[in-house]
């Protein structure tokens, strides 16, 4: 606040602000349809829905229950998921991944600066935010915000759910790391809007995983520690579970630590090895790095079950095949400091929760990186030999919990979920700047949300008519060491001696962990309020609207590509079926007159040549060509069937079955 003396609080005590818990079973029931649960991960995403009394984790169009969080652009189309990841080595600069590490961040953040050097695609500075520049079709350069790329992945999860459920889905619960700050949460919500989703609730990943663990657990109170180490982020949450009540006691973490960092260490090891052994530096060769990244991830996964793997890559550089062993011991040595780094947040969370190690009843492992034996061992050692619980699927637990929360919000959960109550917490302390740059805390970290707290401040100077409210998050005592979330002015305060006006500042954190701040002059009733988000990083409503339009255009473009491929397949199928029909003695070969056969074969030959010459024709061209071929072939086939007294179920179209997509 503009020159407000920290000690000049007129109401020294907070209006203790109702620290209220919330039951979400009845909330928003009327306006929500089926609410899906989406785990939007750094490396993989997953979607679930609560149906027929249990959660279904939904497989994508490739039959996989987790989908790579990858997006790629080629000269003709946009690819999402496996299709994007599988072509990354041949199209590195146009293949985007790890976008969760950029969302809600500033371009100058040290993590962003570090990541820029590690990814093959181009990250640029736009209005202080990291944006991704990529060539889309026809060589056109396009700039995307991290929210837009995340929206493409959310859109893929939405499509996956819609295909399974056979209906349109508008509402979702989306998960975020517990340690995500305000800007990152708001940016994730914006991504949902761009994807055409109403994000009914943002919930923390470890809390969602705790639901997956505790949904069917009855009996007394249990303290559980959720250790969530994923592809790009790390969270620790400590909860008490008691007959359906999930209360978060403390949370901690690192939003930039995960499996991708372990892969990077393997890559750096092999880059050095190649330089030493072959005198070749591949650190700037995006194609080689793409191949190496894929194999590093594969090797890391294999080392969870084996003690040694061989990393083999055909033609890694200059036509040279690469083959080198990697042992589990070497992998652990390369990542030793990162593995040990996970123990810091565990200790802090335990301190904040005020629990002894012996008071933790269960340790729940979430995230693919918890399969690493060394990580499990460190955790086991910290808890004096206690074995972690492996009862939840580490890849699916978060989406599972999100789907349960979705069913509570929609009212579709029924008796199974009606007693569930989530009491989550704000991960970081929230406060304002008072005189001398002091961080005056209004909402301490690990406060149960939603919550509302007010405090009265006054002016620092005589005749002061404006105060500036600067809102920060962080644990340090001075605002210069905390993160500025936003600021706004309250104008029109009547002139008065210093210390006279009473300005009430109210902080309200909603169930999504997003902060609203209001300042009111008690004398005049004049007030200002804002939803605090990373003021420079937040997308404006105009930008969100534009991105929604562009997302719809991309979806339309994707639809056109599919229709074009379907039309081509239809033509090809007809031609090959007809070719088979006129060439098969059991079908029409012996029944056609020479002139008829020649006419049909000529039409089919011409159609196949046309297909070869027109690989990227439009849908209408394929349809027109099909009509041309049918106009020649169908009358001849009909005439033959009539001459032979009709055929059982005689098709006049060469037996084409239009109802099935070809594989």
From Swiss-Prot:
Q: Which residues are glycosylated?
A: 614
Q: Where is there biased composition of kind Acidic residues?
A: 654-663
Query: Which Gene Ontology CC terms are recorded?
Result: cytoplasm; endoplasmic reticulum chaperone complex; endoplasmic reticulum lumen; membrane; nucleus
Q: Where is the signal peptide?
A: 1-21
Coiled coil, from the record: none
Question: Which residue spans traverse the membrane?
Answer: none
GO function terms (MF aspect): ATP binding; ATP hydrolysis activity; ATP-dependent protein folding chaperone; heat shock protein binding; protein folding chaperone
Chain positions of motif Prevents secretion from ER? 660-663
Q: Which NCBIfam families match?
A: PRK00290.1
Q: What does this gene product do?
A: Probably plays a role in facilitating the assembly of multimeric protein complexes inside the ER.
The protein's name in its UniProt record:
Luminal-binding protein 3
Which organism is this protein's natural source? Zea mays (Maize)
